Amino acid sequence: MSNMEHDRWSRVKGRLRSSVGEDVYSSWFARMDLEAVQQESVHLSVPTRFLKSWIQTHYSEKVLTCWQAEMPEVCRIDLTVRSPMRAAVTKEAPAPAEHRRDEHRPAADARSHAAAPAPSNHDALGGSPLDPRLTFASFVVGRSNTLAHAAAKQVAEGRRGDPVMFNPLYIHSGVGLGKTHLLQAVTWAGNSGTERKVLYLTAEKFMYGFVASLKTQTSLAFKEALRGIDVLVIDDLQFLQGKTTQAEFCHTLNALIDAGRQVVVAADRPPADLESLDERVRSRLAGGLVVEMAPLGEELRLGILKSRVVAARTHHASFDVPQSVLEYLARAITHNGRDLEGAINRLLAHSKLNAQPVTLEMAEHEVRDLIRPQEPKRIKIEDIQRVVARQYNVSRSDLLSSRRTANVVRPRQVAMYLAKTLTLRSLPEIGRRFGGRDHTTVLHAVRKIEGLVSKDVTLSDEVESLKRQLQE
C-alpha cells in the first residue's frame, strides 16, 4: 500500500468512525483492512464470514459514502474474507527475534527453555470450579440431546490449529437438562492434555473478573489473558449484565473467533431471546451453531436414573433399586435431571440410614414433593409465526415484511396477538421479532384482535384453533 493510499484509508476510517460511533466501529470495522484501490472500486477484507455478512447487510452504503467523500469515482466496494494464514503470518512476524535469542543460549539452557510449560493464563484468570463428575463418560445421551452432545464432543476432541467447524457453539435449554454437564465435560476433556488451554467461566465469574480488573487497573492483562485462551467456555450467559461488561464480552468474542479460537456458550434461551444483551452480542452468538436441548423423554430419564444408581454403587456396593421403581421414577419425575439425581440420593440415604431395601412404597413417599404438575408447553414466537402463516396461506416472510395488503395484515395482527397472550415476551421484543416494528404497532394489533374476537365468531374460532395447535 502506497503512502497516499494509506493516508486515504486512514481518512476513510476516520469518517466511518465519526459516522457510526466508537462502539459500533470497534465491534465491526476495527479488523477491516484495505487490500486494493482500483479506478472505480475498492477491495476491502475482513477476517470472518460473519463480519462480511453483517457489514454488507447493515453498513455497505455507509462504507461506500465514506469512500466517495475521498474518491467520487468509486462506485463499488468489494468485501472479501481474508485467509486466516495471512493473519497468522502477520501476527507471528516477530518470532524470528525470539529464535535468534535462543541460538545464542548454551545448549542446556536452550533445552530448559524449550521444555518449560507455556504461561498458564487460564490459571491466572481463575476459572469457575469444575465438578469432577461432569464428564462425557457420565453424560447420558438420548434423542433430546444427541446433537448437543455430538457438537460438544467435536469441540473437545479438536486440536490446536484444526479448522473450527462451528463458532461459537451455543447450547440452550431449560434448567437441569444437561447444559452445564456438557460445558464442563468439554473443559475436562480439553484440559486433559497439555496442548490446548480451555477455560470454563460462568457469566457471573466473567463479570466479577472484569470489574475487579477495572478496580485494580489490570484490565489490559485481563483482556490479554482471556484472548490467549484456545477454548473459552461461558455458562449461564443470561446473567451477563452491564453495558461495559457486555461490550468487553463482545470484543472478547470477536477477538477469539477472528483468531480461530473456539467459543462455547450456554444459556436458558436462544440468542434472540436474550433481551438484556446488546444486539451485537446476540447477532454474533446466533451466527454460530445454535443447538437446543429439549426436555428429557421418559426413555432418557430412565437411562439417567440407571446411570446414577451405577455411580452410587462405586461407594455403596450393596445399593440397589428395582426396575419397577426406576420405571415409576422415570414416569413420575418429568421436570429435569437434577430432580432425578435428587430422587436417587434420597433413596440411597433412606436405604442406608434405615437399613432397608428400596421398595416402590418407599420411593412414592420419598419423592412425592419432586412430582410436579405438568408444565404448559413453552411456545416460541417462531412457532406462532409458522402456524399462523400455514393457517392463512401466507409465508413467514410475509408476516415480517412491510406489506399492507389485507391478506397479510390480519394474519400478522393475529400472530402478534398470540405472541402477546401465549408468551412472556415484551411488546418491544415482539415488535423486533416481527420485522423490527415499534411496540405501539404490536399494542395496536393486540387491541384490534381483542376487540374483534368478542364480535366475530369466525375469527374467534380461528384464534382458538391456532391456540390448540400451538399448545398440543
UniProtKB/Swiss-Prot annotation:
Q: Where is the composition biased (Low complexity)?
A: 113-124
Asked if the Swiss-Prot or TrEMBL record annotates the protein with the keyword Ribosomal protein, the reply is no
Basic and acidic residues bias: where?
A: 97-112
Q: What is its main location?
A: cytoplasm
Provide the binding site for ATP.
Answer: 176, 178-180
Q: Which InterPro entries match?
A: AAA+_ATPase (IPR003593), Chromosome_initiator_DnaA (IPR001957), Chromosome_initiator_DnaA-like (IPR020591), Chromosome_initiator_DnaA_CS (IPR018312), DnaA_C (IPR013159), DnaA_dom (IPR013317), DnaA_N_dom (IPR024633), DnaA_N_sf (IPR038454)
Q: Quaternary form? A: Oligomerizes as a right-handed, spiral filament on DNA at oriC.
Name of the protein in question? Chromosomal replication initiator protein DnaA
Q: State the organism of origin.
A: Rhodopseudomonas palustris (strain BisB5)
